[in-house]
């Protein structure tokens, strides 16, 4: 199991968050974990918002499919995402 450290930028809060995730994590699962983390940090739970959100990779310059996993995209340590 490979653990990655990634950064997530949430423009809604103009803040970035560091996360540790497994390389085999699906994009859907990553987005779920991100919304929980951001909700806890900002005390603004994003329940029901997940289906409205998109995750983009800054390094790859593309929107990521929820059905794929980080490993499918070749995501590594230090990759940065935007949750919009």
Where are these regions (language model features)?
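Ubiquitin system architectures
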Residues: 1-84
